[in-house]
A protein has these predicted regions:
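Aromatic-lined, polymer-binding surfaces characteristic
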Residues: 30-31, 37-41, 47-241
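Extended, charge-enriched "interface" segments that sit outside catalytic cores
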Residues: 1-42, 49-53
Length: 241
């Protein structure tokens, strides 16, 4: 595996070390309860964003796209193997990669998109589906019980939490507890959009780069809700359009 994360330079890691800051060489210990980790230590030059960014699994979407284009199972196999390896190396709530609900939500949605692209591959078997389903249930439980709501305004972290609850809530809509998470996420998503997005569609902080991020975090769940047959309020639609 060769990749670059947040200016680390080209790194080779096989198997992938999900706990390492490749820029400084610092590694967060395995098997520690997520609330006991020190994310920022001013005594060294470690950057927790490096392992966390890698564990968001954005790169799995590229592998999924490669499979769709080529139908080559080497790409679907890599998606499956990386997810299985991540689950093994990051038991629920016991790694640095469970320390922030925003990252948990982003990872879950990326997994869902990547898996959707490779579902017709013979590599995706029942054993794997059961394993990833269990992990995604852990993800939605974690998000709901670690919400990052701010006051008087929330921001990208809370929006990510709510987006994750919408995506995972629709996936597991037949599970009563998850339906509760979804209902909460839906009402809060609408409230946050009305609070944070001006009627003109501009985010209240009026920062171009931040506006771009918030558009993604609000628009994707709204469009998913529409696709799932929900009647999205007109003012919500126009704020994210």
């Amino acid at each position: 595996h060769r990749f670059e994360v947040l200016g680390s330079g080209l790194i080779t890691s096989d198997p992938i070390d999900w706990h390492c800051d490749f820029k400084s060489g610092f590694k967060w210990p395995h098997g520690k309860y997520y609330k006991k980790y020190i994310r920022v230590n001013k005594g060294d030059n470690s950057d927790v964003k490096v392992p966390i960014e890698l564990s968001r699994c954005h790169h799995l979407l590229w592998l999924g796209e490669a499979y769709l284009i080529t139908q080559d199972d080497k790409y679907s196999s890599e998606v499956v193997n990386e997810i299985c390896h991540w689950i093994k190396e990051n038991p629920y709530a016991y790694s640095i990669n469970w320390s922030c609900a925003m990252d948990v939500a982003i990872r879950a949605v990326n997994w869902m998109y990547a898996l959707n692209m490779i579902m017709d591959s013979k590599i995706v078997d029942d054993k794997f589906c059961k394993q990833v389903t269990r992990s995604l249930l852990e993800h939605v439980y974690f998000i709901f019980h670690n919400l990052e709501k701010g006051a008087p305004y929330s921001g990208n972290h809370y929006a990510s939490n709510l987006s994750g609850l919408i995506f995972l809530g629709l996936l597991f809509k037949d599970i009563p507890s998850v339906r509760t998470y979804f209902d909460f996420g839906l009402s809060e998503l609408y409230r946050e959009i009305r609070n944070e997005v001006l009627p003109t569609g501009v985010h209240y902080e009026k920062s171009i780069s931040y506006h771009r991020l918030m558009v993604e975090l609000f628009a994707y769940p709204v469009f998913l809700l529409q696709k799932a047959g929900f009647d999205v309020p007109l003012d919500i639609y126009y704020r994210v359009k």
